[in-house]
Structures are given as structure tokens and as C-alpha cells.
Design a protein with these regions (language model features):
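Terminal domain-initiation and capping elements
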Residues: 1-91
Length: 91
């Protein structure tokens, strides 16, 4: 399984000065490099913007479980016209 493969790793990248947080995959699958962004979160004002959510259960759900209200979370990976139809903040 990917998360326990010693050749592939997940890395957390934090840019506190720019309020960006990324979880990336890095490694090798045979002779092909694996490199991609699983999660990209940015803090903008008082909202948490999720630009990329590649987790199976969703990082938004984990943030809600941690006590962050849905009104403070924007699903930025959805187009603006779709966001009002989610349970989360629009912008």
C-alpha cells in the first residue's frame, strides 16, 4: 500500500510566512518518479481554503472533526458557482 511503501513518502511542507500547507507524495514506482500534491491548504483572512484535497475521507471532514466550523472552511477546489451548494463557506 502506498502509505507504507518505503520507496514512496508523504512530506508535509509548511510556508508559515505565506500561510500555505501542502502534503505531497514523493518517491519512485519502478523507474517512474512519483511526485504530486495530495493536500494544499491556505489560510486567507479568517478562512481555511482547501485548494486540493486528495485524501480518501477528505481533509475538510478532518478539520471539522478537529473543531473547525464549516463556516470557516472554503472548498476552493470547487468553482464559485458550486460552493453555495455545499455545507461549507462560499468565500
Amino acid at each position: 500500500d502506498f502509505y507504507h511503501d518505503p520507496v514512496k513518502k508523504c512530506r508535509l511542507i509548511i510556508s508559515e510566512d505565506r500561510n500555505n500547507f501542502l502534503l505531497i507524495t514523493l518517491g519512485w514506482e519502478d523507474d517512474v518518479q512519483v511526485h504530486g500534491c495530495l493536500v494544499h491548504i491556505e489560510v486567507i483572512g479568517d478562512k481555511i481554503w482547501i485548494h486540493r484535497d486528495g485524501l480518501e475521507d477528505g481533509i475538510a471532514n478532518e478539520l471539522v472533526k478537529a473543531g473547525i466550523p464549516k463556516t470557516q472552511i472554503v472548498l476552493g477546489f470547487h468553482p464559485p458557482n458550486i460552493r453555495p451548494h455545499t455545507e461549507f463557506a462560499v468565500n
